[in-house]
Amino acid sequence: MSIEIANESGVDIDTDAVLAVARHALDEMGVNQLAELSVLLVDIDYMAELNHRWMGGDGPTDVLAFPMDEGSVDHGPGESAVAGTEPALLGDIVLCPEVAAKQAATAGHSAADELHLLTVHGVLHLLGYDHAEPDEEREMFALQARLLAGWRSTRST
């Protein structure tokens, strides 16, 4: 599996941990090992610009997910993701460490923990999960929590 990461945020980030949590989530979701993912960490101004341009939002957001090769992600939430044998471009996850740090302070955990959560959140969006409806939110957030707990348990051994 190819995961590219670029930190253009100006914030010192443990990119190895971001890569590891993304890889864990993709592996646990059964994503084809030939899949490709890009993770971009950006500053608050660029995130606000992206949020406005692509989502119609005002101001920065924490994470954006841009699926690339939607035809190759032949599944619905909960089904095998990108299970084929051909390379698939999953897409891009864009994270804003500054927004993550603010959210982390409110949530009472570290900025790193928030970035890990947002990375998994972005992966799930690329795989077709959403949280627009209450039942979708429950399913997605429960899966997100399970994936994070599984990843954290591998780091503490």
Curated annotation (Swiss-Prot):
SUPFAM superfamilies: Metalloproteases ('zincins'), catalytic domain (SSF55486)
UniProt cofactor(s): Zn(2+)
Pfam families assigned: YbeY
GO molecular function: metalloendopeptidase activity; RNA endonuclease activity; zinc ion binding
Record-linked InterPro entries: MetalPrtase_cat_dom_sf_prd, YbeY, YbeY_CS
Cellular compartment(s): Cytoplasm
EC number: 3.1.-.-
Cofactor binding note from Swiss-Prot or TrEMBL: Binds 1 zinc ion.
GO cellular component entries: cytoplasm
Binding of Zn(2+), residues: H121, H125, H131
PROSITE patterns membership: UPF0054 (PS01306)
Family: Belongs to the endoribonuclease YbeY family.
Name of the protein in question: Endoribonuclease YbeY
Protein's gene: ybeY
